[in-house]
């Protein structure tokens, strides 16, 4: 067998200067981030969120619920029901959360809001009782 002398392989270990180069880079990085924190308004995100909402009387999208909205709505509501959320319809022996969610959807009693985003960044909020299934 041949002895392994190590050759040029350092095993992933790289030598570095212990002269404090890391601390200098860290100081430079924190100085630049402090300049940005002075400019940011903490309520700016909340203010722009309400500006993107379209009022109910100016809605542009259709009143029909898409199959994707229905699937997400049923899945979310079934998850809530499985975690002991209050049920909004009378049960007739159903124990499956998905079947209960279907029954709530048919009765238009699901207490969720569907948010539809538009290409321009605006959005519309629709309640389940406003949409046709």
UniProtKB/Swiss-Prot annotation:
Acidic residues bias (residue ranges): 1-32
Main location: nucleus
Keyword Transmembrane assigned: no
SUPFAM superfamilies found in the cross-reference section: RPB6/omega subunit-like
Subcellular location(s) of the protein: Nucleus
Sections of the chain in a coiled coil: none
Function: DNA-dependent RNA polymerases catalyze the transcription of DNA into RNA using the four ribonucleoside triphosphates as substrates. Common component of RNA polymerases I, II and III which synthesize ribosomal RNA precursors, mRNA precursors and many functional non-coding RNAs, and small RNAs, such as 5S rRNA and tRNAs, respectively. Pol II is the central component of the basal RNA polymerase II transcription machinery. Pols are composed of mobile elements that move relative to each other.
Known partners and oligomeric status: Component of the RNA polymerase I (Pol I), RNA polymerase II (Pol II) and RNA polymerase III (Pol III) complexes consisting of at least 13, 12 and 17 subunits, respectively.
PANTHER family: DNA-DIRECTED RNA POLYMERASE SUBUNIT K, DNA-DIRECTED RNA POLYMERASES I, II, AND III SUBUNIT RPABC2
Protein name, entry field: DNA-directed RNA polymerases I, II, and III subunit rpabc2
Recorded name of the encoding gene: polr2f
């Amino acid at each position: 067998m041949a002895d392994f002398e190590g050759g040029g392989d350092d095993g992933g270990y790289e030598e570095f200067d212990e002269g404090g180069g890391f601390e200098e880079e860290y100081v430079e990085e924190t100085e630049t981030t402090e300049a940005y924190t002075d400019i940011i308004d903490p309520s700016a995100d909340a203010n722009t969120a309400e500006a993107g909402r379209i009022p109910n009387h100016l809605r542009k999208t259709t009143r029909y619920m898409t199959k994707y909205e229905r699937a997400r709505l049923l899945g979310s509501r079934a998850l809530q029901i499985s975690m002991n959320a209050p049920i909004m319809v009378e049960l007739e022996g159903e124990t499956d959360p998905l079947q209960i969610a279907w029954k709530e959807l048919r009765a238009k009693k699901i207490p969720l809001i569907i948010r539809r985003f538009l290409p321009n960044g605006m959005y519309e909020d629709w309640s389940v009782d406003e949409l046709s299934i």
